[in-house]
Amino acid sequence: MSGRDNRGAGGGGGGHQPLSSAMGKLKEKLTRAGDDQGYHRVESNLSTSNTATSLDTILPEDPFLFPQAAPQRHPLPRPQQQQQQQQRQQLRLLEDEPPLSFRPLLEDDDINEPPTQPFQQQQQRTPLRASGSLELTPLPPPPTSQEIREHRDRQQRSVPVPVEDLQRSKQSLKGSRVSFEKNNASSKPPAQAESSDEDSFEDKRIGFQQQKATSVDHKGILKDLKHILANDNRRQFQAKKHVSLDVKGTRFLQDLLKESSSEEEFHKTRREFQGRKHQSLDPRVTFKLDKVLQGSSTDSDEEGDDPEHKRLIHRPKDITKPLIIDLKDLESESDEDFHTSRQHFQQQRSISTDSRKSRRPYEMDEMGNKRGENIRHAVPFVRQITEDGKPKLEVYRPTTNPIYIWTQVLAALSVSLGSLVVGFVSAYTSPALVSMTNRNMTSFEVTPQAASWVGGIMPLAGLAGGIAGGPFIEYLGRRNTILATAIPFIVSSLLIACAVNVAMVLAGRFLAGFCVGIASLSLPVYLGETVQPEVRGTLGLLPTAFGNIGILLCFVAGTYMDWSMLAFLGAALPVPFLILMFLIPETPRWFVSRGREEKARKALSWLRGKEADVEPELKGLMRSQADADRQATQNKMMELLKRNNLKPLSISLGLMFFQQLSGINAVIFYTVSIFKDAGSTIDGNLCTIIVGIVNFMATFIATLLIDRAGRKILLYVSNIAMIITLFVLGGFFYCKSHGQDVSQLGWLPLSCFVIYILGFSLGFGPIPWLMMGEILPSKIRGSAASVATAFNWSCTFVVTKTFQDMIDFMGAHGAFWLFGSICFIGLFFVILYVPETQGKTLEDIERKMMGRVRRMSSVANMKPLAFNM
């Protein structure tokens, strides 16, 4: 390109200003574009024949394009340096290609239009030298706006540029005539992105809306699929639902069968009904329920508009549209049939919808619907159901820490040693009276009347101790009350061992009986308030087992010791009991009742373990105590006489009465004497040992059966066993008293005694004590339990005191027949009045007994002391 062409374009003073203005705009635009693309700015002098203009040109950072005038660079980060090195290696492959050139713009050029020259024409230009001089080339005519739009459309429809061409195109200038041609035609320069071109903005918005619509369509398709799937599942459920509720279908079939006039018509009608029935299994089928009308059914009517003979099943046109069914369409002959069908359907639905609910976790009583019934009494009662389908007696949350369970075992073992002392003292008279009535073994005479008082004064003292035990455990505490009985037990045994007359023996027995009455009430209360529910069944057995062990120990030791040495052994037994009681704490519930929260927390920490969290249990005890305080009255004994409380109290007293009037304590106290009078060939002391072992083993058998067979079943078995054995014993003694030879039947008394003890220990031994804690209302449980315990000891005193007199008055056979008759009456009492409490919660039992529900205290869950006395 010659220099005069340029001079002609810019010659004269009038043409210099427009050219300078255009060059200034170009300079500003290229400066911004270069800064955005990461190019350095280099000053160059563009020389013409008569015009010298300073222009800031844009040079790329690659030194290969301009090796003579490489600009100074600042140090770049390592990732950018590595990228530049890769670019240099790629560009060295192009060393044989000629360098690119550019020219300045003329006045008549449109600087806003993109370059249209091909890349091959730019490569034919002369390279830019170090001096900055340029060789100018003529420009082609600028493209029109229509050509630019067509070019953009072709760019949008073009195939994406490869990565190598894209990286190479980044090295070229964008958006001006002083530019290097780029192969990536789809990318736009930043300077052009900043322009306010409405066409470019509209194109971008249209493209974005198309992408958005496409994504929305995909989401809509997924949503429709989910809706169709859910609707299909719902349709299947509706099919099952209305099949179970369709009481009209069977009636319709019956009507059709009744009106069939021939066997062929009968089979045809049955096939049609079966077809409709099996068609209901199709998940795509919904139900159309029509009211059943009272009319005749014929084939012509079924074709017509008679709703009775319309098909109950049809296929809807739109399978995604749900069918709304009104329950009023399910018309039945009576409301009772409708409610029964609905309840049955609800039960089946709860089972079919979730297989995990096939076993009901709870059951609910039906609400009363009597007219005028108070709504507060119509609230249904909910009970938890165990895995075997039976109601659960008590619901507890496991909180036991297995590492520290030994503390609760120690507490249960300590109080159980007190139960061992109680059992030993209770059975003392049976082996001791044999040697005590022997003049060669005592320094004083014991008459038969005095011997009856030795055996009967202890139950009388136990009655007084049972009455006094209630206030003692409330004011002194459970632990302190039990601990206070240890020293009197030792003193009472020493009085008997060192006795020089009958009065000292009676004093020792009275003191021992008073302690037995207190211990029989306080021992189960302590265990109920300290042992956790998870181990209460196992540890609650220890007092009963140790009581029977004490009875067995007394029988065994009595075969080798006289009455004095046996009393010394009884004085030594409370010593370990006394030592262990000092190691265990007071019950947390008693501390809470006295407002000693910190001591209650320490007691719980000792029982549950140092690492256990006792705050939830402590808060529960405080809430329970607050409820008990609100329900408490000043005169608790008057509460026993209320109408709602008399029924459970009378049942508890009746069980205690028939327990003692069965003659159990009389048999235990006079076992040796009975075998001696019977003339049995078996040693009397051996018989007592056998009876004690049977009593001990029967306790564990009853523990295994009481929650499986039920309370009333065991009471039936116990009554029948005692009735049979008592009447057989009475017959044996009747034959002996009338001079008949019974020497060949020496085994019969022992067999009857074993069966009698076994039957008693299975039912009437532990169940009256257990049901006392179950049926007595929580509000009066403390006072009512004291009355029941006192009544039990009163009956024990009467039986043991009058047993010898009954034998003298009516003979042994008369006494056993009397006890058997009382057991026979007790059998009818159990059948008619005693409720079954197996598998029922305390709330349910109280609601059945009293007609309302109260909050149960955890003290009520204690297992009473149930050893035989």
Curated annotation (Swiss-Prot):
Q: Which residues form a coiled coil?
A: none
Gene Ontology BP, a term: trehalose transport
Q: Does the keyword Glycoprotein apply?
A: yes
Q: Where is the composition biased (Polar residues)?
A: 343-353
Q: Which domain of life is it from?
A: Eukaryota
Bias-annotated ranges (Basic and acidic residues): 25-43, 147-156, 258-291, 354-368
Write out the GO cellular component annotations.
plasma membrane
- Please give the name of this protein: Facilitated trehalose transporter Tret1
What does the organism's lineage look like at the top?
Eukaryota, Metazoa, Ecdysozoa, Arthropoda, Hexapoda
Q: Give the encoding gene's name.
A: Tret1
